């Protein structure tokens, strides 16, 4: 009977140790069973037996080992069994930041069509402020910068009117060859892109330069500016790829160049933050994605599909647990790519 119990306790200890992983609530079966050779007994509680025959009940929140001197607590007597707080279920994945910040970011939707322009609020809820039907765009800082064969300037002509909606600003922009700008909660229209104020014609409006955090969305491979986002340091531009039939998948060209053969396609949305004036052309890039799509996307890169199914399941649990435990509301991102 004692040897049978020891074998059972070994299995129970493994289950208890799994239950002690922080941040991830674990729940075992309501009953454990042991066969003593004659009867099947239901054990409502788990016990460990030491070499001297002493026994100790194993609480749900403890990890114990049976030793020659009795049962010893290994750790994990307390853990937070509350569900981790993931605002709106969104994980922020840092793709480019610090020394890896980018001069420009090229996005190409692989599944879906068009982007919504907007920003994420403090609850990680996307607030839309405009859109485009283009499926390939480039995001740049509003400064003097060259991207491929296209040159952009920091100066523009701004019309005098303020518009209450994106549609109204877009209509005005279409009539004068300009583009709408979301400016601290309202809309303006700007025209052109000039390297200096002297180069900009002032006949249609006032010559202005964007703020220190202003960014532009450009039609990929052209000098056509689609949208400007100029809200200072309080908000960062986010682009939400659109796909009416399901989750959009987007390729980030710069990540593909950096990682070679890796496809660098992502679920979710993308946030762009312009760095300080020390490097005014640089942009950080953060992927905003739901926890489950994040796990679905990251697991194949960490473990190939040739692994046993149970191993893949375990890897998915690890990826989910790690992301859930790394949520950092006060930081710029939670995990890195």
What are these regions (language model features)?
Residues 2-337:
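Conserved, single-site charged/polar hotspot
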């Amino acid at each position: 009977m004692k040897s049978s119990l020891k074998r059972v306790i070994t299995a129970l200890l493994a289950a208890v140790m799994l239950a002690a992983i922080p941040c991830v609530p674990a729940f075992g079966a309501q009953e454990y069973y042991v066969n003593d050779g004659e009867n099947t007994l239901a054990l409502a509680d788990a016990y460990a037996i030491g070499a001297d025959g002493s026994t100790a009940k194993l609480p749900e929140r403890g990890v114990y080992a049976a030793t020659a001197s009795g049962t010893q607590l290994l750790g994990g007597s307390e853990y937070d069994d509350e569900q981790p707080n993931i605002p709106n279920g969104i994980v922020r994945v840092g793709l480019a930041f610090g020394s890896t910040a980018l001069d420009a970011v090229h996005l190409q939707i692989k599944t879906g069509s068009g982007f919504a322009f907007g920003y994420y609020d403090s609850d990680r809820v996307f607030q839309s402020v405009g859109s485009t039907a283009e499926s390939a765009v480039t995001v740049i800082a509003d400064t003097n910068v060259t991207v491929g064969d296209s040159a952009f300037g920091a100066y523009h002509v701004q019309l005098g009117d303020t518009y209450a909606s994106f549609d109204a600003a877009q209509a005005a922009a279409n009539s004068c060859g300009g583009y709408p700008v979301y400016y601290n909660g309202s809309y303006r229209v700007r025209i052109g892109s000039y390297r200096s104020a002297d180069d900009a014609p002032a006949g249609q409006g006032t010559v202005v330069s964007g703020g220190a955090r202003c960014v532009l969305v450009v039609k990929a491979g052209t000098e056509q500016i689609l949208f400007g986002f100029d809200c200072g340091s309080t908000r960062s531009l986010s682009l939400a790829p659109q796909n009416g039939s399901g989750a959009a998948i987007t390729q980030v060209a710069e990540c593909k160049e950096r990682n070679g053969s890796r496809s660098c396609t992502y679920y979710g949305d993308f946030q762009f933050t312009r760095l300080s004036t020390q490097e005014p052309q640089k942009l950080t890039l953060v992927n905003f994605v739901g926890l489950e799509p994040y796990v679905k996307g990251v697991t194949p890169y960490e473990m190939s599909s040739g692994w046993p199914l149970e191993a893949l399941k375990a890897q998915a649990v690890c990826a989910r647990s790690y992301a859930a435990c790394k949520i950092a509301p006060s930081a710029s991102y939670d995990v890195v790519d």
